[in-house]
């Protein structure tokens, strides 16, 4: 299911047995090593420099890479997203100083490597992703996914809904991703949520899409979403304002049911996140992204993803750094995370 090199496992054991011990403070959880004791360039390139393991068994939450961009319609490169997000995550520390969240004092978390996708066959990749996530979800672990293009969310939600039933969705994106097909193909990064509706994977009364914008092929690009009962919040409704009030409404709408967070990095303005395949001008800010994710605290979150980071268009590394921090923020709002 998960591809990991034997040498990576050995290096991880050596690193975390010898170098990370000083920052564990007798914790029974995995803890990112402090740069006070372990230099940031040292060790295996894992998410947050956490231990690497081949299975999600025994974990409360796991970072999972899905290095696939076969479903892209514009600029490729998201297959390298997981690798670069992991590399930039060395800057993320143990505690969330802004919210007080202490995920590594609360949950057992590790990096379980990458799904062995088939870059030559998108339907087969979807099967591989679905089967991998069925095992992860069945173990009781909450997956936090490093994408990859947005087509990966469809098979992930197949696995998640198999266990939890139809889920609510907090979807941040420049696009609704509800197209039906392109060039005769029904699976690509513009169709995941259409396919999810077709298969009953979403509780459509609890779907919110935030940051949608850009030109359209149709005169009413939101008609399909509205017809399903989705709430669409265009980017224009977010300009120059805090999204804290909006997220209060979202929490009420989501209620106690299972919720999945899907965050396409192109939901943010390309001034902040240029390293993506289908950028659209006039998007959200990083501060609004934090308000959205932190506003999900208290929800019954059963999975998250951060998709569409394409490092080849990210010269400074800022897009991947932003992605790494947003994934950390998602970890911080999972059920069971204590505050200091």
Curated annotation (Swiss-Prot):
Keyword DNA-binding tagged: no
Keyword Manganese appears in the UniProt entry: yes
GO BP terms: putrescine biosynthetic process from arginine, via agmatine; spermidine biosynthetic process
Subcellular location: Mitochondrion
GO cellular component terms listed in the entry, alphabetical order: mitochondrion
Residues annotated for Mn(2+) 1 binding in this entry: 150, 173, 177, 264
InterPro entries registered for this protein in UniProt: Agmatinase-rel, Ureohydrolase, Ureohydrolase_dom_sf, Ureohydrolase_Mn_BS
Catalyzed reactions per annotation: agmatine + H2O = urea + putrescine
Record keywords, A-Z: Hydrolase, Manganese, Metal-binding, Mitochondrion, Putrescine biosynthesis, Spermidine biosynthesis, Transit peptide
Cofactor dependency: Mn(2+)
EC id: 3.5.3.11
GO molecular function, one term: metal ion binding
Binding site for Mn(2+) 2: 173, 175, 264, 266
Catalytic class of the enzyme: hydrolase
Pathway: Amine and polyamine biosynthesis; putrescine biosynthesis via agmatine pathway; putrescine from agmatine: step 1/1
NCBIfam families with a match to the protein in the record: agmatinase
Protein family: Belongs to the arginase family. Agmatinase subfamily.
Stated name of the protein: Agmatinase, mitochondrial
Source organism of the structure: Gallus gallus (Chicken)
Lineage of producing organism: Eukaryota, Metazoa, Chordata, Craniata, Vertebrata
Annotated gene: AGMAT
């Amino acid at each position: 299911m998960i591809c990991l090199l034997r040498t990576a496992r050995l290096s991880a054991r050596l690193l975390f047995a010898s170098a990370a011990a000083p920052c564990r403070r007798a914790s029974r959880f995995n803890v990112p090593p402090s740069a006070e004791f372990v230099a940031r360039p040292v060790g295996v390139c894992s998410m947050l420099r956490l231990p690497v393991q081949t299975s999600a068994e025994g974990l409360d939450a796991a970072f999972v890479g899905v290095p696939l961009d076969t479903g892209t319609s514009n600029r490729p490169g998201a297959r390298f997203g997981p690798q670069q997000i992991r590399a930039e995550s060395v800057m993320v520390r143990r505690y969330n100083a802004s919210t007080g969240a202490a995920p590594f004092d609360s949950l057992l978390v590790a990096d379980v490597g990458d799904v062995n996708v088939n870059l030559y066959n998108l339907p087969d990749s979807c099967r591989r992703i679905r089967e991998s996530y069925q095992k992860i979800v069945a173990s009781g672990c909450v997956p936090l996914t490093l994408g990859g293009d947005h087509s990966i969310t469809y098979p992930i939600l197949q696995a998640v809904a198999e266990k939890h039933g139809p889920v609510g969705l907090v979807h941040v994106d420049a696009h609704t991703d509800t197209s039906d097909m392109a060039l005769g193909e029904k699976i690509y990064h513009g169709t995941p949520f259409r396919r999810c509706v077709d298969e009953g994977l979403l509780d459509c009364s609890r779907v919110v899409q935030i940051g949608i914008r850009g030109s359209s092929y149709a005169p009413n690009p939101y008609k399909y979403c509205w017809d399903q009962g989705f709430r669409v919040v265009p980017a224009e409704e977010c300009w120059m304002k805090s999204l804290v009030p909006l997220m209060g409404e979202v929490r009420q709408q989501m209620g106690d049911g299972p919720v999945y967070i899907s965050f396409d990095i192109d939901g943010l303005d390309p001034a902040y996140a240029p390293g993506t395949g289908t950028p659209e001008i006039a998007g959200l800010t990083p501060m609004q992204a934090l308000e959205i994710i932190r506003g999900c605290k208290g929800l019954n979150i059963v999975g998250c993803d951060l998709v569409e980071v394409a490092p080849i268009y990210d010269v400074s590394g800022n897009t991947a750094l932003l992605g790494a921090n947003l994934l950390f923020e998602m970890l911080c709002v999972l059920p069971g995370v204590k505050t200091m």
